[in-house]
Amino acid sequence: MTTAKLVIDNLTKSFDGQHLANNHISLEISPAKITAFLGHNGAGKSTFLKILSGKQEPTTGNVSLETGKRMSVLEQDHFAYDQFTILETVLRGNKKMFEIKEEMDALYAKPDFSDEDGIKAGELGVIYDEMGGWNAETDAQTMLSNVGIKEDMHYQMMSELENKDKVRVLLAQALFGNPDVLILDEPTNDLDIDTIAWLEDFLADYENTVIVVSHDRHFLDAVCTHIGDLDYSKLNLYTGNYSYWYQASQLATKQRAQANKKAEEKKKELQEFIARFSSNVAKAKQATARKKMLDKLNIEEIKPTSRRYPAIIFDMEREA
């Protein structure tokens, strides 16, 4: 099995030419990595995911995925599939496979089925087989059962479901068919602890690219291999799970603050020397040298995080 890399090149999204949701973001997200994107409400996470999934266009830059690779996104519109059965909703998660099946069914249903139709149907059948289509319904039913949708519900209409069950069906749809890139926005919402545990195990064994946004710190600790921290429209990457990111980001801020403190002390010392000896002929050269040192001294502006609290992920009481 070949795997796909998602490439993000110089991505910027601005609104009204002023407000930046994302600013010059470039990175490659490789297979077998689960990357979570963190940030306060309004930091640009949702905009970023919409651009990655093709639902929004960036102001500049681009997102590329190898031709023929499939991206699957956890649907946020809980009414989008109300006219379909639960099982069909999941099968529609693999759009190309579903369209091939529909085309084959339409050919076989023709009252004037011709030899040409037979050849075309045969060709489609080969592609369908290569995609695992003949096992698709069984795979979809298994996925539904894994997320807590009982077998006797699989042929119900989506419109008949409560919202908490729609969430599970749409999660099964996103996971169905082994997509090359999987984008999950708040995947643990409305899930019980057993289903979350199953999802954690599923993702731990997943060999393709996963991108996730979640407020469930426990979930992020369990599944993430990388963290992307969106703050002030910029992206900082960390290797590790949520807890590692939190510790590393706090340490980095502390180290920058300590370096700034030393630089400020050095600046004060140089300024005092220059003020004291700049008019002293004997010390003029030393004063000039210190002036050059002062000009080169770099004191980084450290902004406080744009979050209300250092960590945007809050503790959640998981359902039993």
Task: List PLM regions with ranges.
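ABC-family P-loop ATPase nucleotide-binding domain
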Residues: 1-14, 303-320
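Short alpha-helical segments used as structural interaction elements across diverse proteins
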Residues: 2, 10, 52, 163-165, ...
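A residue-level signal for beta-strand positions that form part of recognition/binding surfaces
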Residues: 5, 71, 146, 271, ...
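ABC ATP-binding cassette signature C-motif
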Residues: 13-19, 23-260, 314-320
